[in-house]
Amino acid sequence: MRSLLVLCLLLPCWLSARELIIGGILEPPLKWLDHSGQPRGLDVDLVTTIFGGLKVPIRIELLDSGARLTRNAEGGVYDLLLSHSYKPERESYLLYPTQAHIRHSWHFFVRKDDLGKIRYRTLADLKPWRIGVTKDFSYTQELTAAMADPAYRFQVIPINQLQLRKLIAGRIDVVPMSLVTAFAQIREEGLEGKLDVTVHRDGVDS
């Protein structure tokens, strides 16, 4: 995924005049809130180090909803975003850098008991199954096109962290997630041994 650090680094004198507000979506271990509500994580450390070196004050706000993050960005609430996935229509109000600071490996997750039952060679193999997707996430052209096809059974929710819980509860059958995000949640919520991944596919833009 990509962030908007490049623009700010080009304008250090202007930026030093006020506090920068940086928005992001909760995505442990990259960005999360500790028990006191303070932002933590690899992305947080990155921007804190960069702007600390520039003597630029920052405030980081982490949300659980990608749709809310996008609305706030479009409305001018934030000066920068942390790791907001690319969509062409967002270029009307966001400046994306040409280089991504991190790349994710995405897989389709299933319940461990269903691993031998759910076959996945092409996306069409998933038509019989309920697929969880997250509102306002940027998916590949193939997956985005499938979401408009009534032959598929997509379920859209606003909060990505609910996807694995829905999967465990049997409310969906398959969900595309990044390995970093999914494994962090699996470890945090004690879901080891309950979920597995299908063969790797480029399911989502990162």
Indicate where each model-derived feature is located.
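Alpha-to-beta junction loops
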Residues: 56-57, 74-83, 129, 168-177
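N-terminal signal peptide c-region/cleavage motif recognized by signal peptidases
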Residues: 12-17
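Ligand-binding cleft/hinge of the Venus flytrap
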Residues: 47-56, 99, 123-127, 135-158, ...
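Acidic, polar ligand-binding/catalytic clefts
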Residues: 48, 61-125, 139, 200-202
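Periplasmic-binding protein-like
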Residues: 24-26, 103-107, 191-206
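Short helix-initiation/N-cap motifs at beta->coil->alpha
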Residues: 59-71, 154-169
